UniProtKB/Swiss-Prot annotation:
GO terms for molecular function: DNA binding; serine-type endopeptidase activity. NCBIfam families: lexA. InterPro entries: ArsR-like_HTH, LexA, LexA-like, LexA/Signal_pep-like_sf, LexA_DNA-bd_dom, LexA_repressor, Peptidase_S24_LexA, Peptidase_S24_S26A/B/C. Keywords: Autocatalytic cleavage, DNA damage, DNA repair, DNA replication, DNA-binding, Hydrolase, Repressor, SOS response, Transcription, Transcription regulation. It is an enzyme of class 3 (hydrolase). The keyword Transcription applies. This is LexA repressor. Represses a number of genes involved in the response to DNA damage (SOS response), including recA and lexA. In the presence of single-stranded DNA, RecA interacts with LexA causing an autocatalytic cleavage which disrupts the DNA-binding part of LexA, leading to derepression of the SOS regulon and eventually DNA repair. Pfam families: LexA_DNA_bind (PF01726), Peptidase_S24 (PF00717). The lineage of its organism: Bacteria, Bacillati, Bacillota, Bacilli, Bacillales.
Length: 207
């Protein structure tokens, strides 16, 4: 199933909730009020994208004719073991990594690529080539299990002093921590304190 943006997910979930509770879909105005969009044209744009991605079907001759067509797709996805994992676009200090404000979109992922509870998993897009010797390339999606501790040698996602997420290999040394790139041309990062956001448990690469 094609991934949805955060806003598209909000609209889709609202439509589905209304259809399932009331038996009929909400109006464009109601959708806009529910998700904080004042412009009806913006709502129509999101509905068009949801339709093109196969989540809904609309009848242009009827104002409220929004049919949820992805329920069956979701059932099929569950049978095939597919989960929708949050993709983290930024990391905010003092806020849980999977907080709504950090999530850019949701990405459909085969369940066999994870080895833990779905709620503990998030995805981070890799930027740069600091981990290429570990087989992690620029543009890859690393699958991360949320946790705050790490063992020496673990590949982790850590928060830097600039409040940015970085993927490095973790080592605890005497009186300091070392975040080691897997790139022989790069120097390690030494920190007195480090915030571990999660451990990399898998990798997804789009060909």
């Amino acid at each position: 199933m094609t991934e949805l943006t955060k806003r598209q997910s909000e609209i889709y979930e609202y439509i589905k909730t209304v259809v399932h509770t009331k038996g009929y879909p909400p109006s464009v105005r109601e959708i806009g009020e529910a998700v904080g969009l004042a412009s009806s044209s913006t709502v129509h744009g999101h509905l068009s994208r949801l339709e093109s991605k196969g989540y809904i079907r609309r009848d242009p001759t009827k104002p409220r004719a929004i049919e949820i067509v992805s329920d069956q797709l979701e059932e099929n996805a569950e049978m095939e073991g597919t989960i929708h994992v949050p993709v983290i676009g930024k990391v905010t200090a003092g806020v849980p990594i999977t907080a709504v404000e950090n999530i850019e979109e949701y990405f459909p992922l085969p369940e066999h690529l994870t080895s833990t509870h779905n709620s503990d998993i998030f995805i981070l897009n890799v930027v740069g080539d600091s981990m290429i010797e570990a087989g992690i390339l620029d543009g890859d999606k690393v699958i991360v299990r949320s946790q705050t501790i790490a063992e020496n040698g673990d590949i982790i996602v850590a928060m830097t002093e600039d409040d940015e997420a970085t993927v490095k290999r973790f080592y605890k040394e005497k009186h300091r921590y070392r975040l080691q790139p897997e790139n022989s041309t790069m120097d390690p990062i030494y920190l007195e304190q480090v915030t571990v956001l999660g451990k990399v448990v898998g990798l997804f690469r789009e060909l």
